[in-house]
Every structure is written in structure tokens, then in C-alpha cells.
Amino acid sequence: MTLLKRILSVVLLALVIAVGGLYWLGTRDDASTGPAAVAADASTLVERGRYLALAGNCMACHTSRGGKALAGGTPIPTPFGTVYGPNITPDDKTGIGTWSADDFWQALHNGKSKDGSLLYPAFPYTEYTRVTRADADALYAYLRSVAPVSQPNRPPELDFPYDQRPLLAAWRALYFKPGVQEADASQSVQWNRGRYLVEGLGHCAACHTPRNRLGATRSSEPLTGGVIPVLDWYAPPLTNDMQTGMGRWTAADIAALLKTGISAHSSASGPMAEVVLGSTQHLTDDDALAIGVYIKSLPATPASLPRQSVAVAPAAMELGSKIYSQQCAQCHQPKGEGSGTAWPALAGNPTVTAASPVNAIRMVLDGGYAPATAANPRPHGMPPFGQILNDSDIAMLVSYIRNSWGNEAGGVTALEVKRARAASTLN
């Protein structure tokens, strides 16, 4: 055998071993998987599961607009194509009617379907793996109690090569490690509960942690914010940086936003408004506050997205000021001080001063309402201005707002507005 053949043989063997190792790592199950919990009271277990399903916002992905509850069909756009939320009602043919509690646990904890096939991580099992077996069994009991719906699942529509499901093994080997969240004995019960909800059932990292080019969350930059792929909304940092994060908020402020959709600092908009509407407003006061306590314990890490340094010309500031006076000052007040929670202050508003201006641009373009909640059933709304202001006007207006009354957030270009308009719900 020549030297070249020997080298090629060694390289080939190394590749086979590497691929085999990746496949093993990507398909392995958590060795700590335990037996199903025994329920003392079935009705109590179902009610607990109903609450957990709300806390985990299951409806958002498993109920299509205008469709039957939990029957699936919701399109979930990703940079790699579209996947559709499956039917998780107890229908035997199209849902999970034939699934056991162990099958359901395998999906939630190990990211595998009943037949052992690997699930796409649009289903956030990377976070749900932290959920306890007891909570998984409660969720299962609740899903078994809902009305079965016969609705076939729609297959994913992914680009090549992302449509090759076996490749998920390599992705999982790199980015997924199954394991239930262990309590930190050095922290309080309240802190541990908040951490469990944020990092596990609430899967906050799915939006609030930046992602790499393969769609995995960057574990080195947890909860430092990021633009939500395809939807083009910015999920701000949950860290305690004073300029870009939650540094100016209290735990009670965070709980108020989760429960009501509004706070002393800002109101929920875009995808977060939907989360409040369908999920967090239903949290108990204790759970909402526990989330706030945990978030306030996070370090003051700056936003992962670098703050823009677009200079704003004096002429643009002057024109932006005129547009603000004509269109905005009546509600938000001449100096951006706002008026209660109905018309939030723009001075110091984290939506305005965020590292990315996209949320502020989208609000001007589309307008919108804070979510209607039990504590705020008739939220005030903001009219859309995308039909009466052009891209240049909106760029100057948002630049003015981001750089007035103590705000120092950088300018906005007409090109950024054009891109946001393309993603606008009113386009």
C-alpha cells in the first residue's frame, strides 16, 4: 500500500468514526429518564396540565388561526423553510391518541417522536428538556382530556439539505444536551421557580437569545436579545444592562408586563403581545413575580447586537421634530414624557432605545394595541402611519425619537424602513 493510500484510509476511517460519533451523540437519550408519575387525583393533574400548557404557550404553535384548539396546522416560518405545528389532540389517527405518557415524555425531553424519529427544533425541546417528568405527565393528562380532532398533519416545507431529517443527528450532537433542570441549592425557591419557567417551560431563549447560522441559540450569549428570524421583530435582552436591557426595571415591573401587557416602562407589542395574550397573563401572581426575580438576577450583559452608530444630520433631526409635533406629540407629549400607561413615555423607553430600531419602526408603520388582558381589557391603541408617511419620513421621525430627551440610540436609514415595510402586516 502506498503512503497516499494509507493516508486516505486513515482519513476515511476518521471520517467514519466522526460521523458515527455525531450520530450517536445526536440520537442519544438522557439516561436520567424516569418512570411515569403516579397521579393521586386525575382532575387535579388535568387542571395542573392545563395551567402548564398556558404557561408554555402550547396554543401558539398548535392551533392555527381560526382552527380548532390544539389541532395543529400553524405555519412556523424559519430561515430554512416552513414547519407546521402538529395535531396534539388525542385523535388516534392524526393526533397523539395512541401515545403513552412515556412517548410524550420522549418528545418533550429527548426531542423524539413516538416512532423514534428526530423532531425538528422548531419545537423547542432544547428548552423543554428541562421540564420535570411530573410536569410532563400533567401536560400529557391535560392533552388527553381535550376533544380529539381529526386533522392530518401538514409535512414540513424545508429547503435542501435541511429537509433531510437524518442530518438532525449532527445538529443535535452539536447543540442539544437533554437534561432536567436541577435546582440551585444556593438560591431561593422563588428564584429557582423563575429560572425553571424562563429557561424551561417558558422557553424565553427561543426569542431572546441570538441564533447562529444553523439556527441554534448561542449558549455563550444567553438572553442577550436578537432579531426573530423571518418575523423581523427584535426580542430585547433580558439581562440587566442599563441601556439595552432590564436594568431600570424592578421584578414587579416585569411581573406587571407579563400579567397585563403594560408597565411603567413600555407595553408589549408584536410577538410579545401575542405571548402575553395567550400565555403569561394566565400565570399566577407568584409565578409572574418569580420570573421577574430570576430575570433581575441576570448579569448586566450588553445586548448581543451592537448598537447602531448611524449619525443623524441636524436637518434630519429638525424634520423629524416637525413630524413628531404633527403626528405624535398629542399622545406621547411634546418632550416624550407620555401620559400614564395609555400613552407610554418615549424618553428612556427600551423599545425606542433598543440596539435594533426595528420594533420602533414596525410600531410606526403598523401601529397596534397592547394585548387585551383581564387586568387591562380595553388597551389603548396606536394608529398605523405606514400609509401616510414615506420611508424617509419614518426614518427621520424614528431617528429623532431615538436621539431626543436623553435618548442616545443612533439614527435610522430609509433603507431600514423599506425592509421593515416589506415585512409589515399592512404591506
Where are these regions (language model features)?
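Short extracytoplasmic
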Residues: A40-P75
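C-terminal structural cap/anchor segments
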Residues: L319-R362
